[in-house]
Amino acid sequence: MERSPDVSPGPSRSFKEELLCAVCYDPFRDAVTLRCGHNFCRGCVSRCWEVQVSPTCPVCKDRASPADLRTNHTLNNLVEKLLREEAEGARWTSYRFSRVCRLHRGQLSLFCLEDKELLCCSCQADPRHQGHRVQPVKDTAHDFRAKCRNMEHALREKAKAFWAMRRSYEAIAKHNQVEAAWLEGRIRQEFDKLREFLRVEEQAILDAMAEETRQKQLLADEKMKQLTEETEVLAHEIERLQMEMKEDDVSFLMKHKSRKRRLFCTMEPEPVQPGMLIDVCKYLGSLQYRVWKKMLASVESVPFSFDPNTAAGWLSVSDDLTSVTNHGYRVQVENPERFSSAPCLLGSRVFSQGSHAWEVALGGLQSWRVGVVRVRQDSGAEGHSHSCYHDTRSGFWYVCRTQGVEGDHCVTSDPATSPLVLAIPRRLRVELECEEGELSFYDAERHCHLYTFHARFGEVRPYFYLGGARGAGPPEPLRICPLHISVKEELDG
């Protein structure tokens, strides 16, 4: 029930004055009563007594004590009621004046639909609102409430969308935590393999050096033993010669021939033979380069990897990111880069210039596509699954195997081309010439050309489609073939 506009709620002035503290002249806050009967705020009387030697009542100066303070619950309740009524009176005054036209002081009973303003009856005749559509406040409020209900419904739907998006980010955060733990393990495994390779190579080189050292030490020991024996023989001969020189002349000369033959047969010392030192160059010469070249022979490299973040729910990418298999649909974390309408995925690299080539092992797969797709500038917002038609008009260039009336055959993504009459390849080679605008496909086993696209490709990524197996056997993988790595050595400069 509305109040009369002439009635203003609120306490009387005399009643309000009775509820004011005699110290701060504000309504009581935590009112207390002294023994003399006067009332004050607890904080006010306490501050007064802080500067007094002996506490007294601030009004009548009667002697008082902090122990005499008694909380006045009745007075506190009256103050609370006073403040509540004052607040209600302020709200009522604001409400009453907000419903009155400031210009004509009339009741706001109309609404101008053009200016979106509340009007009184006098405002309707104002030239500013001449010819405008005006209707009663009640009807306008009914119409606007209906619109607000529609807006409320739209906001609720938007809130649901926000919650759904939040759940997507929660799923992404959980996925990233699991993926990070798995990635950390895989990275450590790969570096452990490299460290193990280097450890084995280091030990092999150290063992070879130790063996050479041992062999040359044995040879040196043998030579030193021989020289020691020869030295002892010579010492014995010197001693014998000294004894003969002390004999009389006849005896000395009688042994001259035999002595000469004996001394002539003594051996001459051999010079130090070459190759006795450890071959330092054999072990330290270009050591890192030689180990690196040996490492290349044991490391498998591919021109690019499969990007698991683009793989549709049907596809499972191997741990080394070089093969993919269609195991049937499984729910994956939602992200805009992922294909959702077909079992497709992309390669990890983006090509926009230069020459590039890669080979794909297809084996006996019965449904596949291999080619490239133009990188969409808005793919971060919409993903790659915006179109169900993966053909040249949508920026897809590929060769695929499909099932026809007369059996399986190969076709291209260009609807205007006829089926390729050559046998279905088991290993496909793709060559991309960005500057020339050529994308060529070859049967890598038969070394024959299949088809060449001519177009302005722009930025493209390798594109793959892998259909499900038609039979009951286990699904076959599609693999990226490893590169043959060779090192060309040239003089610097």
UniProtKB/Swiss-Prot annotation:
A biological process from GO: protein ubiquitination
UniProt feature coiled coil, ranges: 210-251
UniProt pathway: Protein modification; protein ubiquitination
EC number(s) recorded for this UniProt protein: 2.3.2.27
Subcellular location, principal: cytoplasm
GO molecular function, one term: ubiquitin protein ligase activity
Zinc fingers classed as RING-type: ranges: 21-61
Annotated family: Belongs to the TRIM/RBCC family.
Protein name: E3 ubiquitin-protein ligase TRIM35
Species this chain originates from: Homo sapiens
